């Protein structure tokens, strides 16, 4: 189950790194100078940073399933707005939405890992989640550059938005906050189980 949210973490890394590969396209399509391009890229980070404290509160209040599903939907919307928006303002909004939504992935992933895996596997699962995240960064390198050369940046980013929408649906249908919801043993600390 944590793998679904780890996939959102991967998407977040991809979205974080992608502007470096498509910088020339963004500058051309939106008539940007270097400062404006920096601001466009920074929208992701402004939102990401602002969501760190609320993320912990949200995952504790509404649960990993709801939070991850909503985050995937918002990320998909943000990516699609960024991909197909005709103005710089829309691109800013899209990047901000992406940053705010993918910011929940890491904390949510760790919350799920604490419920779905025994304590002696937590470090391994954490490492695997980091690996998935970094794969997103790798995909935003040469693979994205090749895709952009073949299909254009808007199409490549649009495809990533569509895939994120699919992830939202799968997350809502398959993810459960705790293995006990599927009849399996929970690995959550007893304090959390009795809460």
Where are these regions (language model features)?
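Flexible cytoplasmic inter-helical loops of multi-pass small-molecule transporters
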Residues: 176-195
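Helix-loop-helix hairpin linking two adjacent transmembrane segments in secondary transporters
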Residues: 129-180
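Cytoplasmic helix-loop-helix junction between adjacent transmembrane helices
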Residues: 94-132
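Extracytoplasmic
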Residues: 1-34
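Conserved MFS/SLC helix-loop-helix module at the cytosolic interface between two early adjacent transmembrane helices
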Residues: 50-89
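Small-residue-rich segments within alpha-helical transmembrane domains of MFS-like 12-TM solute carriers
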Residues: 13, 17, 83, 99-107, ...
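Helical-face signature of the major facilitator-like transporter fold
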Residues: 5-13, 45, 79, 87-99
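Residue-level signature of mid-helix packing/kink "hotspots" within the transmembrane helices
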Residues: 17, 45-53, 137-138
């Amino acid at each position: 189950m944590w793998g679904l949210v780890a996939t959102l973490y991967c998407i977040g890394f991809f979205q974080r790194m992608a502007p470096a590969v498509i910088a020339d396209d963004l500058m051309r399509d939106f008539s940007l100078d270097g400062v404006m391009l920096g601001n466009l890229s920074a929208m992701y980070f402004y939102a990401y940073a602002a969501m760190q404290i609320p993320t912990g509160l949200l995952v504790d209040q509404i649960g990993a399933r709801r939070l991850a599903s909503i985050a995937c939907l918002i990320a998909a919307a943000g990516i699609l707005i960024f991909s197909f928006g005709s103005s710089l303002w829309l691109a800013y909004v899209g990047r901000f939405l992406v940053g705010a939504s993918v910011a929940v992935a890491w904390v949510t992933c760790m919350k799920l890992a604490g419920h779905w895996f025994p304590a002696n596997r937590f470090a391994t699962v954490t490492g695997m989640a980091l690996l998935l995240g970094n794969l997103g960064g790798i995909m935003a390198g040469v693979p994205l550059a090749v895709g952009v050369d073949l299909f254009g940046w808007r199409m490549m980013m649009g495809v990533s938005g569509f895939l994120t929408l699919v992830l939202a649906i799968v997350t809502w249908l398959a993810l459960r906050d705790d293995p006990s919801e599927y009849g399996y043993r929970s690995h959550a600390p007893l304090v959390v189980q009795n809460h």
